[in-house]
């Protein structure tokens, strides 16, 4: 960064009597850009590195208020840390691959890259108007080959480490977007996270990453993330879903050598198993189903194929199932038990089979009663007077009964004992089970990062040599074909020679899940111009982990989990030192706008159609409308265009409102009146600074006025500094600025020149992170050197907070009778002496000594008369 210099036509000389934000903001933005004010500087010896990062946006072309809130929050944090002396990295980029661009390109008959680059240019300009302290020299776009070259390089690195592999799998197929979805991209209703279509199941050969290899590390290391919201850590823990128990093998009668393996967290209940249940699509169902049950099993499986996972496993309906006719042997006692298939067992969870213990599992009990299956109690409640009815299941602790040699053990003791017994006899083993599945990264779409693999009939799947990266996307191909990847139709691109044997071969035509590119972008920002590697270890280790990450809670499982996996995997390959990418995480709340909804039809009405806001009525049926605050969206007619707000009030007002209206983690309700209120506050500051700039230098300063002003200033410094540490209570920090401005407006004129200068310097520096343009203007008009954003954050002076004198109440028999002004550090003995000598004591004690004197230092003296 070059030495900062204000415009040659001094800001003060161009100032007017009115606050005109647009011209002022444009002028300072141009100067900051010209002088590269926010260019990242490597930390000096002893200087802390602070990496502040917002989750980078998809370039839709339009900035919305959710974006504004995210980026302004991060910007304030970056600005404060820079003023506190840290070396700050605050970059921005674009998560630019994905289906929306591909679909838009098909609709407009242009290349997705053209559409995306146009949107990036538009959004970059919109972000620029917010006055963000971003180092644009580090900008990246995941759709540009100089970025996705390194996504491919990292894929090959994971492939070399055995973490990337291909297999045939039953996958989630989106029939609208014509692509495969990861499990995390299918909601609880079985619908695609993006298109909303009901997801179908298909068998395809797909690429996966072994995220399950890191399940324990991903779960256990959540305890280290004390700077993350507890809600996010809980969501990740539940998604990983570690269960500790045992795998148990049940042999199948009449099928020698065939066994069914179940996973259970309750091996202590093994003697109570009265049936087994398989998932309808379990691999053994066809083999085990008898001819007598074939028709009913086939019909049931067809029915299950039409239902979503949520519909199958919902607790709101009875559990459905049919017998296969096959029988298994309980290895613990040799008893024969029937094998069923049921809706609530899923093939891709656990082993796809469960053991039914109706006496000690509520769901199993319901299923057994419904289908008249036997119930055998094997756990007895012990140590309590609690009675378990025959008509209910007991899932709590107790003592084993009816369990052969294990009877009398506590259920915790029995878990280990029965598992060990099974292990000794070859039918059980201790096991950890996870809900987490390997990450499916194949996508049958065009606009994504090509997978750098070549398929050879002789050599199999061969990695593209790294010196041949990037494998670039071809242009000019038909994107509209149904089914399969559009890349498969680019024959000239697909046909290559095998790097291993030189024979004809074909490129992989699937592209990567867009989350592949966003799982490591924070690393590239540390070294964005490196042409030899995705990042240099020295640069990454200098800046990582990200000190403060800001983004929506909707990314709690997908992006944040994948990024943690990537970091751990790359750490294991000695590419970086940190094992966690983000030290602190702030999940900002949504920005909500007023909606008008017809409760009779569910239709949302445009605010423009509502004539009377105090009594909103539907213009069509005349009935009353519900007035709600909901997340801004086009369909609900409640969006607010950031550009329109900036055009009317300026970026500083928009920033101040966003920060003041609600704590960052809470939802924010948009209110035009409050926006206007912030604009008026900035106007008051303008007049305050204008008054100081035009002050004649003469003041009737007194020691008392100076101490009052300094006390107000240093109280504000202390309070704002605390509000901007850890919890980031921007709203209360701005409240403190308002209090300070009120104090200065009423008392500054009576202060000495030195105190006035101290007060205004502190006010402007405290304002700088929130309203950077106006603070810069004020700083220059007040004669400050360099940029205000290069100034040190003010420190409060504890001595300035000490009051010179205080008022102490005098009570007689507990009733207030007067007060006295005393030194703030007045001792208890001195307070008693002064109270007894006061006119109040002379009047109410009538010259008699009190029976008792109660002194509360700093607050009151209570005189208790002798009679």
UniProtKB/Swiss-Prot annotation:
Signal peptide: none annotated. Keywords: Aminoacyl-tRNA synthetase, ATP-binding, Cytoplasm, Ligase, Nucleotide-binding, Protein biosynthesis. Residues 308-327 are annotated as: Disordered. The keyword tRNA processing does not apply. ATP binds at residue 634. This is Leucine--tRNA ligase. A motif ('HIGH' region) lies at residues 57-67. A motif ('KMSKS' region) lies at residues 631-635. Its EC number is 6.1.1.4. Belongs to the class-I aminoacyl-tRNA synthetase family. One of its GO terms (cellular component) is cytosol. CDD domains: Anticodon_Ia_Leu_BEm, LeuRS_core. It is found in: Cytoplasm. It catalyses: tRNA(Leu) + L-leucine + ATP = L-leucyl-tRNA(Leu) + AMP + diphosphate. It comes from the Bacteria. One of its GO terms (molecular function) is leucine-tRNA ligase activity.
């Amino acid at each position: 960064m070059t030495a900062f210099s204000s415009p040659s036509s001094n800001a003060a000389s161009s100032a007017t009597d009115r606050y005109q934000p647009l011209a002022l903001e444009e002028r300072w933005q141009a100067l900051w850009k010209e002088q590269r004010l926010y260019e990242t500087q490597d930390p000096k010896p002893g200087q802390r590195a602070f990496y502040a990062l917002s989750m980078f946006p998809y370039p839709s072309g339009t900035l919305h208020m959710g974006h504004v809130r995210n980026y302004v929050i991060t910007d304030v944090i970056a600005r404060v840390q820079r003023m506190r002396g840290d070396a700050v990295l605050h970059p921005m980029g674009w998560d630019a691959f994905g289906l929306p661009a591909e679909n838009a390109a098909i609709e407009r008959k242009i290349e997705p890259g053209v559409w995306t680059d146009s949107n990036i240019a538009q959004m970059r300009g919109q972000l620029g108007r917010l006055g963000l302290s971003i180092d644009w020299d580090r900008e990246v776009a995941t759709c540009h080959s100089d970025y996705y070259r390194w996504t491919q390089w990292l894929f090959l690195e994971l492939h070399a480490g055995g973490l990337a592999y291909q297999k045939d799998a039953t996958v989630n197929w989106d029939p609208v977007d014509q692509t495969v979805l990861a499990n995390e991209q299918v909601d609880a209703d079985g619908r695609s996270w993006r298109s909303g279509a009901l997801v179908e199941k298909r068998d395809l050969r797909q690429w996966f990453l072994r995220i399950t290899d890191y399940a324990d590390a991903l779960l256990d290391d959540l305890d280290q993330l004390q700077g993350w919201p507890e809600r996010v850590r809980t969501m990740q823990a539940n998604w990983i879903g570690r269960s500790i128990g045992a795998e148990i093998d049940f042999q199948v009668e009449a099928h020698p050598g065939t066994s069914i393996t179940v996973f259970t967290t309750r091996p202590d209940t093994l003697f109570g198993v009265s049936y087994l249940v398989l998932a309808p699509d379990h691999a053994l169902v066809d083999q085990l189903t008898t001819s007598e049950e074939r028709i009913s099993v086939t019909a049931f499986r067809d029915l299950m194929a039409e239902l979503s996972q949520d519909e199958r496993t919902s607790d709101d309906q009875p559990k459905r199932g049919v017998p296969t006719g096959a029988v298994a042997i309980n290895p613990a006692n040799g008893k024969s038990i029937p094998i069923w298939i049921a809706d609530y067992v899923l093939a891709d969870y656990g082993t796809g089979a469960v053991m039914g213990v109706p006496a000690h599992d509520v769901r199993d009990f319901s299923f057994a009663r419904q289908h008249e299956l036997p119930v055998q109690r094997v756990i007895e409640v012990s140590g309590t007077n609690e009675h378990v009815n025959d008509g209910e299941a007991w899932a709590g602790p107790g003592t084993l009964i009816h369990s052969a040699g294990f009877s009398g053990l506590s259920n915790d003791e029995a878990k280990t004992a029965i598992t060990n017994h099974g292990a000794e006899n070859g039918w059980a083993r201790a096991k950890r089970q996870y809900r987490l599945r390997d990450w499916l990264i194949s996508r049958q779409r065009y606009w994504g990062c090509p997978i750098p693999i070549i398929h050879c009939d002789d050599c199999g799947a061969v990695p593209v040599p790294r010196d041949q990266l990037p494998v670039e996307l071809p242009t000019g191909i038909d994107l509209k074909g149904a089914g399969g990847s559009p890349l498969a139709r680019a024959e000239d691109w697909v046909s290559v020679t095998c790097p291993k044997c030189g024979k004809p071969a074909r490129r992989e035509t699937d592209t990567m899940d867009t989350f592949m590119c966003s799982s490591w972008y924070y690393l590239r920002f540390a070294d964005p111009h490196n042409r030899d590697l995705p990042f240099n270890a020295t640069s990454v280790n200098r800046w990582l982990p990200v000190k403060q990450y800001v983004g929506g809670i909707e990314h709690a499982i997908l992006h944040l989990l994948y990024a943690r996996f990537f970091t751990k995997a790359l750490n294991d390959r000695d590419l970086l030192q940190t094992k966690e990418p983000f030290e602190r995480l702030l999940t900002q709340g949504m920005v909500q706008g007023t909606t008008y909804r017809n409760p009779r039809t569910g239709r949302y009405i445009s605010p423009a159609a509502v004539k009377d806001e105090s009594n909103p009525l539907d213009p069509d049926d005349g009935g009353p409308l519900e007035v709600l605050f909901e997340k801004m969206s086009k369909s609900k007619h409640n969006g607010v265009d950031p550009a329109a707000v900036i055009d009317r009030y300026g970026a500083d007002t928009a920033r101040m409102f966003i920060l003041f209206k609600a704590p960052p983690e809470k939802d924010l309700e948009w209110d035009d009146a409050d926006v206007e209120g912030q604009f008026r506050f900035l106007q008051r500051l303008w007049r305050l600074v204008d008054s100081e700039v035009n002050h004649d230098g003469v003041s009737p300063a007194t020691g008392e006025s100076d101490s009052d002003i300094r006390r107000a200033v240093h109280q504000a410094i202390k309070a704002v500094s605390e509000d901007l540490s850890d919890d980031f209570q921007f709203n209360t920090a701005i409240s403190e600025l308002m209090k300070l401005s009120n104090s200065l407006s009423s008392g500054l004129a009576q202060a000495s020149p030195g105190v006035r200068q101290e007060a205004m310097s502190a006010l402007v520096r405290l304002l700088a992170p929130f309203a950077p343009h106006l603070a810069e203007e004020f700083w220059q008009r007040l004669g400050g050197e360099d940029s205000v954003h290069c100034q040190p954050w003010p420190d409060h002076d504890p001595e300035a907070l000490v009051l010179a004198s205080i008022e102490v109440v005098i009570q007689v028999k507990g009733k207030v009778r007067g007060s006295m002004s005393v030194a703030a550090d007045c001792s208890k003995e001195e307070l008693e002496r002064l109270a007894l000598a006061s006119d109040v004591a002379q009047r109410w004690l009538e010259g008699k000594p009190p029976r008792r004197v109660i002194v509360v230092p700093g607050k009151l003296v209570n005189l208790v008369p002798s009679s």
